[in-house]
Swiss-Prot record:
Broad EC category: hydrolase
Disulfide bond sites: none
Domain (USP): residue spans on this chain: 445-949
Entry's EC annotation: 3.4.19.12
Gene Ontology terms for molecular function: cysteine-type deubiquitinase activity
Protein name per the record: Ubiquitin carboxyl-terminal hydrolase 38
Quaternary assembly: Interacts with isoform 1 of FBXW7; this interaction prevents FBXW7-mediated degradation of MYC.
């Protein structure tokens, strides 16, 4: 029968005839044949299968072999034995090479035919060894795929025990050697299919024998981390990623990133090659593992690797966005790489030139998937332009291309950036070693205490959080200038963009410290604030005068010129201001005008003067302040000095003698000639007589609507103190007024009225006083209620002819001295005026913790407030503008907008507040601000910043939407951006070195948690890095001196 079949397949008979005869041969297989005939038939069919010249011959061989093996199984079992199979695997078959896939297919088919025979067990044992040998020989993808098919069908052939681990490792190495040089789609598809079969085999082995998984993954890492330049592992290894359980991510990444045997060069290679895996079309979860490794490296602070890999691979990842199959994973990795690379715009700017073309291409195809992708990409681009807003020339084409897609809110952008930063990645393994010192979750930067410099830190943070002021400072062009404003701009830029948790403002401190301030000793923050604003103001005036004299020359501003501020200020202020355009930045932001009006009670003539102020110093009403004074000498008692004047803006310390006028009556602000009895109280207030001071009727104001303390005492509010500040005052006794009309000292009535309100209203609560009798400094510990919404009474002057004729309105920052009233000259005429209640929102609160100005600690609460707020559109509609009357400027609760104001306060209560405590910045709430003194009696509000609210933006050129102020802040100049980028790189290097040092010491060091950057490095003294409401946990005794 074998001779007939052999002659038939090689004959020239027609193919249909051959098929009929072959069918007859197959049907005859059920007839009896002796062993020799069967063996001859098996030899012939094997030759036809392996060496057939055409598909017909090979098909005939398969059909006949299958038929005769089924009916003559013992004979086929004897033929298909271990020796025969081993010969095929070692020598091949005649001219057929042993690595030919046909041989493996033949063995695969032979196993199916003898599956029920006992001898198959011997073949299984043989093949367990042989398949391991074959894999070690690095078979080509096609042969490896056929081997995978065989082992998938016959799992008994897979090596067992320790050999299974070796087999998996060798199979991983084999996949690492796969290559496909063809560019034809059909061949590429076939290659991907072959790789998929091999990876599926590994998955099955891992499931059956879990012990093989970890060694296999170690082999994967060994392959991709190899630094051998002669070998580049195949991207086909990406096919294995989808089979690794996601539950193992944490364990594996921690093992990789903390293994001291893994060198940086190897880790860099591994990460680069994993990013290359994004090109593998069918791989799943590659992006998940890549991002996990990126986060793991950030957690152990290996920033050098992250920087190198990001710059090397960011363009490749962006390029993968063009390919639909790998686009989702590529976008996820691109987003993480860009959002975490926050110390420099370098990575983002590598892809900026390619963004517009990509956006236009996807917009034109109109597919829903493309639109959804562009929405995600647009959000990413907005985040990056927000973070690096100093490059309008690069970003304008991108903004134009993505203008039709939604822009995320600023809050969302900040949240995304904060969560993505390298320094925000937690490391549970290192938790017992050190707290990561990256930016806090707030995204804000602290200021390092340089030695009792909390008075400066708290003020700087309050000014930085004054959004409009910060933006104006950052927008100034001060290149080539060494002025104090330039140093403030530099400090603001670092607070906004540094990666550090806290910044050390050494240069600014040395430049801004008043000469009389002793270094490393506690100072008064209010005094420092006044000095700082005055210095900035005078400096700008000098520059403007120099610019007017030398318009064609480039101004050089140096420290030496700044030292001449005091001497030149008087000369420069002789020129009166004529327009807002001539105002300095400090005048625009913090400058207001206060009119002092004095009326002689004898001749009824009046005199007045308008002066500028940068802050208002508010004294406490005598009744409450005398009851709750803190004294360094417990035996001393307060001494009341009568006849003093209230100061509006004081350049010196706020610990000047706080003197209260004992004859102050009710709150009446009437600049017109009023024939009524002076001191008649308005309906909502009453005055109680106090005869503790001889010959004076010391009247004390009590607001009926102020919250009551336990025991019936009232808690004064800032509104009350402001009312008290603006209340009329009778000048008598030693404080009599010299009337030029009467040519003698006379009793007089003095009133003060705000005629021009500032953008930012600074209020200082006069808590520190000097007792001249006992020679001790005292602090008033009264709790003061802080309203979120404050209405400032501003008296608009509609006719000022008489005033302008007799007095020029000088805008200089000098104090209203106590003898000012006696120097005022009579005006002779009255002017019409009307009062407008200007709404302000509480922006910042500087708190003093302690019992004396020479000790204790400062910290501040603050929040972001811009010039406009949607809720205040309605507010301005409810404002009433009325002519001045005897009670027009009272700030009581019965004002027309009181109900609406209360509603606004409720809305503002829920807004985000920050607690700035030197290096530490935390989230807090307004409730914490309100309750600080009740929780910590020695922690009291001291300096307040209120932001004026506009129905429309009143600051020209400060519109965040104008130009390209991506994040509301102006773009940083190149000089500042370069400095920040350089420092951020330095910071990352410092963190990495520290992390490596800790890792080396971890094995022998005891695990004791002591956060660095908190209070370890702070200098000794009365000022420390923590404390205060909202974050406090210290007891009262421990908070006196930190």
């Amino acid at each position: 029968m074998d001779k007939i079949l052999e002659g038939l397949v090689s004959s020239s008979h027609p193919l249909p005839l051959k098929r009929v005869i072959v069918r007859k041969v197959v049907e005859s297989a059920e007839h009896w044949l002796d062993e020799a005939q069967c063996e001859a038939m098996f030899d012939l069919t094997t030759r036809l299968i392996l060496e057939g010249q055409d598909p017909f011959q090979r098909q005939v061989g398969h059909q006949v072999l299958e038929a005769y093996a089924r009916y003559h199984r013992p004979e086929f079992e004897s033929f298909f034995n271990k020796t025969f199979v081993l010969g095929l695997l070692h020598q091949g078959y005649h001219s057929l090479d042993r690595k030919d896939v046909a041989i493996l297919d033949y063995i695969h088919n032979g196993l199916k035919l003898i599956m029920s025979c006992p001898s198959v067990l011997d073949l299984f044992s043989l093949l367990q060894v042989e398949v391991l040998r074959m894999v070690c020989e690095r078979p080509e993808p096609q042969l490896c795929a056929r081997l995978s098919d065989l082992l998938t069908d016959f799992v008994q052939c897979i090596p067992k025990g320790k050999l299974s681990i070796t087999f998996c490792q060798q199979l991983v190495r084999t996949i690492g050697h796969f290559q496909c040089v063809s560019t034809q789609e059909r061949e590429l598809r076939e290659y991907v299919s072959q790789v998929t079969k091999v990876s599926n085999l590994l998955q099955n082995i891992w499931k059956a024998e879990p012990a093989t998984l970890l060694p296999s993954l170690q082999e994967v890492f060994a392959s991709i981390s190899s630094t051998d330049a002669s070998f580049e592992p195949s991207v086909a290894l990406a096919s294995l990623v989808q089979h690794i359980p996601l539950q193992m991510i944490t364990v594996l990444i921690r093992s990789l990133t903390t293994d001291p045997n893994v060198k940086d060069a190897s880790m860099t290679q591994a990460l680069c090659r994993m990013i290359d895996w994004l090109s593998w079309p069918l791989a799943q979860h590659v992006d998940t593992w890549v991002i996990a490794l990126l986060k793991g490296l950030a957690a152990v602070q290996k920033f050098t690797i992250l920087i190198d890999v990001t710059l090397l691979k960011i363009e490749l990842v962006f390029n993968r966005l063009w390919f639909p199959l790998v686009r989702p994973g590529a976008l996820a990795v691109l987003s993480h790489m860009l959002l975490s690379f926050q110390h420099s715009p370098e990575a983002f700017h590598l892809i900026v030139p390619h963004v517009v073309n990509l956006v236009h291409s996807f917009k034109n195809d109109g597919l829903p998937s493309s639109t959804a992708f562009l929405v995600q990409l647009t959000e990413l681009i907005h985040c990056m332009m927000y973070h690096y807003s100093g490059f309008p020339d690069l970003y304008e084409p991108i903004l134009e291309a993505i203008k039709d897609f939604p822009k995320p809110s600023e809050e969302k952008i900040k949240l995304i950036l904060n969560q993505s930063a390298w320094t925000s990645q937690s490391n549970s393994l290192a938790s017992c070693l050190s707290r990561l010192s990256g930016k806090s979750e707030t995204g804000k930067t602290g200021l390092i205490n340089l030695g009792n410099t909390c008075y400066m830190n708290s003020v700087i943070q309050a000014l930085f959080m004054a959004t409009d002021f910060r933006r104006q400072v950052l927008s100034l062009n001060l290149n080539g200038c060494n002025s104090l404003m330039k140093k403030l701009q530099h400090l603001f830029a670092f607070l906004a963009h540094t990666q550090r948790e806290a910044y050390a403002p050494r240069i600014f401190f040395e430049a801004s410290r008043p000469p009389w301030f002793t270094p490393r000793s506690q100072q008064d923050c209010s005094e420092y604030l006044r000095f700082l604003l005055d210095r900035l103001h005078e400096e700008e005036k000098i520059l403007k005068v120099q610019a007017s004299h030398k318009p064609s020359e480039i101004l050089e501003c140096s420290e030496t010129s700044l030292q001449e501020v005091a001497s030149k200020a008087a000369v420069l202020t002789e020129t009166p201001r004529t327009s807002d355009g001539e105002k300095t930045l400090i005048e625009k932001m913090f400058g207001g005008k206060l009119r002092t009006h004095i009326r002689c009670l004898n001749c009824r003539s009046t005199s007045q003067k308008v002066e500028a102020f940068t802050d208002l110093s508010l004294a406490f009403c005598p009744s409450s302040s005398l009851e709750n004074m803190s004294v360094q000498d417990p035996a001393s008692s307060p001494s009341i000095q009568d006849g003093g004047l209230m100061q509006a803006s004081v350049p010196g310390p706020s610990e000047e003698p706080v003197v209260y006028n004992p004859t102050t009556a009710a709150f009446i602000c009437d600049s017109l000639v009023n024939e009524k009895t002076i001191g008649s109280p308005p309906n909502e207030f009453y005055c109680s007589e106090n005869t503790s001071v001889p010959n004076e009727s010391n009247k004390i104001l009590v607001n009926k609507d102020v919250p009551q303390k336990p025991g019936g005492e009232t808690t004064p509010s800032v509104t009350d103190l402001l009312n008290y500040f603006l209340a009329p005052e009778i000048l008598t006794g030693d404080n009599q007024y010299y009337c030029e009309n009467c040519a003698s000292l006379q009793n007089a009535e003095k009133t003060m009225q705000i005629t021009e309100e500032p953008e930012y209203l600074i209020l200082t609560l006069l808590r520190f006083s000097y007792d001249q009798k006992y020679h001790v400094r005292r602090k008033i510990l009264d709790n003061v209620s802080l309203p979120l919404v404050l209405e400032l009474p501003v008296k608009r002057i509609t006719s000022f002819s008489s005033l302008s004729e007799s007095w020029s309105v000088d805008v200089d920052f000098t104090d209203l001295s106590e003898n000012l009233a006696k120097k005022l000259k009579p005006s002779g005429t009255d002017e019409a005026s009307c009062t407008k209640l200007v709404p302000y929102l509480l922006s910042s609160v500087v708190v003093h913790s302690g019992i004396s100005s020479e000790s204790g600690h400062y910290y501040s609460y603050a929040r972001n407030i811009t010039s406009t707020d949607s809720s205040y559109q309605m507010y301005h509609q409810s404002e009433a503008l009325a002519l001045a009357s005897s009670q027009s400027h009272l700030l009581g609760r019965d004002s027309p907008s009181a109900v609406f104001e209360q509603d606004l306060e409720n809305k503002e209560m829920s807004k985000e507040w920050f607690l700035f405590n030197d290096s530490r910045v935390t989230f807090t709430s307004f409730q914490s601000v309100q309750k600080i003194t009740s929780r910590f009696p020695k922690d009291t509000a001291y300096v307040l910043l209120y932001k004026k609210q506009h129905s429309t933006n009143g600051l020209s050129g400060n519109n965040p939407t104008s130009g390209l102020w991506i994040n509301g802040d102006p773009p940083l100049q190149k000089e500042l951006m370069d400095a920040i980028t350089k420092d951020n790189k330095l910071y990352l290097q410092e963190q990495e070195l520290n992390a490596r040092a800790r890792a080396l010491q971890a094995a022998s060091a005891s695990c004791s948690f002591r956060p660095n950057g908190f209070d370890d490095n702070d200098p000794p003294g009365s000022c420390g890095p923590t404390g205060g409401g909202g974050g406090g946990g210290f007891n009262t005794v421990g908070r006196l001196v930190f």
